[in-house]
Each structure stands twice: as C-alpha cells, then as structure tokens.
Design a protein with these regions (language model features):
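Histidine-dependent nucleotide/RNA phosphoesterase domain, centered on the 2H-phosphoesterase fold
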Residues: 2-351
Length: 351
C-alpha cells in the first residue's frame, strides 16, 4: 500500500484542527492543486476559507449596492450600524473585529462613541471580500439583536368606543367584588388598551424610519382583505395553564381578516432583521387584548409574580366587550405615554 495513503500530508486549520490533504492526479491539478512543487520545499500559505455563497447571494443585501471602487482599484463600503452594536462588533480587546478582518481580508473602521457618524467603513482589495465582511457583520448584528430588549411594538388601539366603555365596567365589577389579591394596579390603563401585532428592537432613528417603510410595504397585503377590519371581543382567558397563578388575563379577539393581515405582517417583518426574539420564533400572532398583568403592580416583587384569577373567570369568563373597527395600525414606543395617555406613536399605517 502506498506510503502516501497511510501518511498523507496534513493541513492545520486551527490550533486543534488538522485535516488530510487529498492526493490529486496532476491532470486535475496535481502538486499545484495541493500547494506543493516537485523538487522544492512546501510553501506555507495561510488557510483561506472557501466562500460557499458567492457574490450573487450577497447582492440580495441592499447595502452591497453601495460598495464603491476607488481610483486605485480598492473597494469601500460605508455601512450604517447603530452605536448599540459597536461593543459587540469590536469584541473583547478588539477580538471580534480582528477575526472578521482576518477571515475576510478587509479593514474595518468602527466610529468612536463621540463621533457623529454611525457608519462602519469596510475596505478591501476585492468586492467579494467586502461582501463576505458584510455578511459576517449582518449575522453578528442579528445575534446581538436577539439578546436585546424590545423597544417598539405594532399596535391596534382599543381605547375608545364600546370596547373601552365595557372594559371600565368590567374593571369596576371586579374591584367591587373585593377578591383576595386583586387590586387596581393589576389593570391595564383604560386609555392604553390595545392589541399587539408585533414587537421589535429599533435602536436609532434610522431603524425607526426603516421600520415605518417596512410597515408601509405591507399596504399591498390589504388588497385582498376587507377593511376596516371588524373585531369582536368576548370572553376572558389567561396566558398560562393554572388560573390560581395567573400572570396575564386577556380578552379573546375574533377578527379573521385582521388575523390574516397580522400573520402576513409578521412574516414580512421577520425578513427585515428588526424583530425581537419572540417574533422571530413564532408563526402566527395571537390576537388578544390584555386586561390585567402582574407586571403593572409597582410592588410586584413583594406581591409575588402572579395573581389568583379563578373567581374572575368563574364570574366574568363570558364577558362581552362588544365590537370595534380597526382602521389603522401604529408603531408605538414601549413603556411610553403620549399626550392622550396612549403610547407614543412613531408612525401609522392608515386604511
């Protein structure tokens, strides 16, 4: 048996990774293919990871169209990146930035915190190198965004008309019943009741404006739907299985047309990279109107992380809030209050 088969040349990929270099007949590359020359010592070359995607895949990223070629033949890309991602992009002592630069053979400049520009600048000798760096930065940002708390949500306001009036009546009836562990702080403010159609992480004005453009891009989805959306709110349910340890109590919402639109919007935004983790992991929006939430309590830690909703469900489980129409969806700021005591609205899709 050939000695070359038993003891083939080995290529070091990293500190703990070694791979055999296959022997190829010279008609198919031979020694040249294996990086060896007959009669000469083997030359050490840095391992270069093969690009399994190709430039065409990177062209799907709109930012790739902004790559510029300089007079000396080099390439440059200015990429908008919110400052909140700078720490993760740089890494401990610059390790992450340095790794991307080495793997893609590019130079990456990250603005300092006191600089006005939010553009990360990527430079390289070849366009494909910039595309590879762009792809890695995009993947890194997606990973970092998953770890961040949501900042905005898509909402249908329910704070007017019959539904709001009936909510006030239900709240009064529950409080008058003087049920153990139930107090006014558990209830959603009457001017803030809403449906949530999506939750996002938007870290600067550029991302907020982009989210509004994506929301407007959902307008064609309305063409095959009947608007305004008719909604009926009837019955009470809880998010968990045990009503004696309830965290969220909500009103059931029936609206087939709104459900279709909400699910289509969810699918659209999942492709934008702006969704919070919860939205990326779901296939459908659960239409519901939150009525009571233990997190609303100022003393939530002292009172425990749940409340007993058994008697509420027994007495008011079939409560009818009436009907409403949805004529707009709003991009709202989480944990905020506008002039009308609803959430601050960044923009809306009217229909």
């Amino acid at each position: 048996m050939s000695r070359e088969v038993l003891s083939p040349p080995v290529q070091a990929m990293s500190q703990n990774r070694r791979y055999r270099v296959n022997i190829v007949h010279e008609d198919f590359g031979g020694d040249k293919w294996n990086g060896q020359n007959k009669g000469s010592k083997r030359q050490n070359q840095a391992y270069e990871e093969p690009d399994l995607y190709g430039e065409d895949d990177d062209e799907d990223d709109p930012a790739a169209s902004n790559i510029e070629e300089s007079p000396n033949g080099d390439f440059k890309l200015a990429l908008h990146v919110p400052k909140s991602f700078y720490g993760g992009l740089i890494g401990l002592k610059g390790s992450t930035k340095r790794r991307i630069e080495e793997e893609t053979r590019t130079e990456i400049y990250v603005p300092r915190q006191n600089e006005k520009s939010n553009d990360v600048v990527i430079r390289g000798k070849q366009r494909s190198q910039l595309c590879a760096a762009l792809r890695q930065i995009r993947h890194l940002i997606t990973s970092l965004r998953k770890k961040m708390k949501p900042t905005h949500f898509l909402a249908v306001a329910m704070n007017s008309g019959e539904v709001q009036k009936r909510f006030v009546e239900l709240k009064k009836s529950i409080l008058e019943a003087q049920l153990p562990g139930i107090d006014e702080e558990l209830f959603m403010p009457e001017r803030s009741i809403h449906l949530t159609l999506g939750v996002y992480v938007l870290l600067d004005d550029d991302e907020r404006q982009r989210a509004l453009k994506e929301l407007e891009a959902c307008r064609p989805l309305l063409a095959d739907l009947k608007t305004p959306f008719e909604m009926k709110v009837k019955g009470l349910e809880i998010m968990n299985d045990d009503p004696s340890f309830t965290r969220i109590l909500y009103g059931r919402v029936e609206s087939p047309e709104l459900q279709k639109f909400a699910d289509q919007c969810l699918s659209h935004f999942q492709g934008t990279g702006l969704c919070a983790t919860d939205n990326n992991e779901r296939e459908s929006i659960k239409l519901h109107m939150t009525l009571m939430n233990n997190r609303y309590r100022k003393e939530a830690m002292k009172a425990g992380n749940s409340f007993d909703a058994r008697e509420i469900l027994k007495r008011f489980g079939d409560f009818d809030f009436g009907a409403a129409q949805c004529q707009a969806v709003h991009l709202c700021v989480l944990k905020s209050r506008g002039e009308d005591e609803f959430y601050k609205i960044s923009g809306s899709l009217q229909f």
